[in-house]
Design a protein with these regions (language model features):
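Peri-membrane helix termini and adjoining interfacial loops of integral membrane proteins
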Residues: 35-45, 114-127, 214-222, 263-272, ...
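Short helix-to-coil transition segments within interhelical loops
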Residues: 49, 85, 160-163, 168-189, ...
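Flexible interhelical linker loops that connect adjacent transmembrane helices
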Residues: 259-291
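Short, Lys/Arg-rich, polar N-terminal cytosolic tail immediately upstream
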Residues: 1-11
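A short amphipathic helical element positioned immediately N-terminal to and/or at the very start
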Residues: 3-5, 42-49, 321-330
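Membrane-water interface segments at the C-terminal ends of transmembrane alpha-helices
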Residues: 10-42, 51-160, 188-209, 238-258, ...
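Glycine-rich helix-loop "coupling/hinge" segments at transmembrane-helix boundaries
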Residues: 114, 207-232, 318, 478-505, ...
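Short cytosolic juxtamembrane segments of multi-pass membrane proteins
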Residues: 166, 264-277, 436, 529-539
């Protein structure tokens, strides 16, 4: 009877796997494939014959390497200061480092322009100088500050996982603190450093909000593809440019999976160790403290100046305080309402699909579970601009015409954030024994009852955590929806971009502050809710 019940569970897994595969094909592989094969040969040849596009490709790759490197170094210093040195106010510094993750990605660009632009508070009012923040230097600084928290969180986890006995053993053998760091700590940090560099590099390549605002004449593939669609509606050229953008991001993604998957940096043996870590080298402790405090002050300055800009009469000319920018946000209520509505439904799509995929992968009762795992994580390598353009091409005709509707936005957000929700679902499902489900089935429970009464309640923490984080990402998303919004389906982030392009800095700053406030409220609400069931939210 027990084995009979085991067999009764399998068809449900096959059904779940088939449904998940159909959704992945229709709303992920199909749009991606259409963009790759959309351009006609003459159209592709016309685009590729223009050296300007390859210059933009080179610029994008170079910026990924440059910003990825500086963000990783900054993240390492920040993580070392908080985890190993444990500087004063570490909790506050950690919270400050999360702000760029929670805020819309273009917020730092707006703040940099308010500070260092042609009418900037520092450049014009304080220093009486003309400094052109637009271009590759401004973009490099902005993307470093925007994405260094990704490196910080990755490296902080790696530093916490390194046991003190390894470094203490080297110290007991006579190695200096600097030698211990160079020969023991740094090699153990290598997988984290590579992961950080690749993660930030992918994020920089896929970034759209910062380049479109602050890159100026420094051509980047995302901005050129955007201009080709919005300015000329040249889908041939936009598809080629988006495909050029996809290539390096997928390469970095595959390197990350293969390189980190094949290397073993085992530091935990059968015996646990409570030995403390030896003191950090003096020079590094001082440098890490200076870097971390400087970065934190700069982040606070960035968001402080954004708040100041939201209550200034006319930035660059009249700095007297006013609330008119906030009172004028009444006409943005439909955009804010749509943002909350679509973001919530998109998070539901992400969580449900991620849970289904994690279920069939961890239970391994289907063919090629590794294939499902790969396609559940591959959206992390797809720039949002590329996926959004794919949806425009794929769903602009019968029998599945979705353009101009809210459904296309919800589905795009849901599929784009699938890897985030999948990570939480996999981490929790891997810890749940299959014997619980089999025991319930053996007692007569139907497959649906097994999932609803056993599996799902045990996954509450993962569902809430994945839903909270994907909800946050949806609220502040710009790239994936830029081609999908219409006058009937406006969203707040695209409104901010329109305000920036129109020079309405006060309105743009006030709407950005509202979005940041919504993101913080969602985060704190999610943390409280998850703690209520006895778990913690890990970003």
């Amino acid at each position: 009877m027990f084995h009979a019940r085991m067999e009764s569970v399998k068809p449900s897994r096959i059904l779940i796997g088939a449904a998940a595969a159909a959704i992945l094909f229709l709303f992920l592989l199909w749009p991606v494939g259409l963009i790759l094969f959309y351009p006609t040969l003459p159209g592709a040849a016309r685009v590729l014959a223009n050296e300007h596009w390859f210059e933009a490709l080179w610029h994008s790759i170079a910026m990924a390497v440059l910003a990825g490197g500086t963000a990783t170094v900054l993240g390492l210093a920040y993580a070392y200061a908080l985890v190993r040195i444990r500087v004063r106010w570490s909790g506050l510094l950690h919270a400050i480092a999360l702000l760029p993750i929670l805020a819309p990605p273009f917020v730092i660009s707006i703040s940099y322009i308010l500070l260092f632009g042609r009418n900037g508070l520092i450049t014009k009012q304080l220093l009486q100088m003309r400094l052109d923040i637009y271009g590759w230097k401004g973009l490099w600084l902005v993307q470093t500050l925007t994405f260094f928290p990704l490196a910080y969180l990755t490296l902080a986890n790696v530093l916490r996982s390194i046991p003190g006995n390894l470094e203490q053993a080297a110290s007991n053998l006579g190695a200096s603190n600097s030698r211990v760091f160079r020969d023991v700590t740094l090699p153990l940090l290598r997988p984290g450093l590579v992961a950080s560099l690749l993660l930030v590099g992918i994020s920089v390549l896929a970034d759209f909000g910062n380049p479109v605002i602050i890159a100026g004449d420094f051509s980047m593939l995302p901005t050129l593809a955007y201009l080709k669609v919005t300015g000329w509606f040249d889908l041939d050229a936009a598809s080629v440019l988006a495909s050029l953008l996809l290539a390096p991001t997928v390469v970095l993604f595959l390197i990350q999976r293969v390189w980190l998957g094949r290397r073993s940096y085992v530091t935990v043996s059968g015996k646990t160790s409570q030995q403390p870590h030896p003191p950090a080298p003096v020079w590094m402790a001082r440098a890490a403290c200076v870097v971390s405090y400087t970065a934190a002050v700069l982040i606070v300055l960035v968001y402080g100046i954004l708040a100041y800009g939201s209550v200034s009469q006319a930035w660059g000319y009249d700095y007297s305080l006013t609330l008119r920018h906030f009172t004028q946000l009444g006409r943005r209520i439909p955009s804010l309402a749509n943002t909350m509505h679509y973001s919530l439904l998109g998070a539901v799509v992400s969580v449900l699909l991620a849970t289904a995929l994690a279920y069939v992968v961890t239970r391994k009762k289907i063919l090629v579970p590794g294939t499902f795992d790969f396609f559940a994580t591959v959206p992390a390598a797809i720039p949002g601009l590329f996926l959004g353009l794919g949806y425009v091409v794929a769903f602009n005709q019968d029998p599945l015409r979705l353009t101009g509707t809210s459904f296309i936005i919800i589905l795009a957000l849901g599929l784009w954030n699938l890897p985030t929700a999948y990570r939480y679902a996999m981490a929790n499902l891997a810890q749940l024994s299959e014997q619980l489900e089999l025991a319930a089935a053996n007692l007569g429970a139907k497959p649906v009852r097994v999932v609803s009464s056993i599996t799902m309640p045990l996954l509450r923490g993962a569902l809430l955590a994945g839903g909270t984080v994907t909800f946050l990402r949806n609220v502040t998303c710009l790239s994936v929806i830029i081609f999908l919004v219409t006058p009937r389906t406006p969203m707040a982030t695209t409104d901010v971009l329109a305000l920036v392009e129109g020079g309405e800095w006060g309105q743009a700053a006030s709407l950005s502050i509202v979005l940041l406030g919504i993101a913080l409220a969602l985060l704190f609400g999610g943390i409280r809710l998850i703690r209520h069931i006895g778990q913690e939210l890990e970003l």
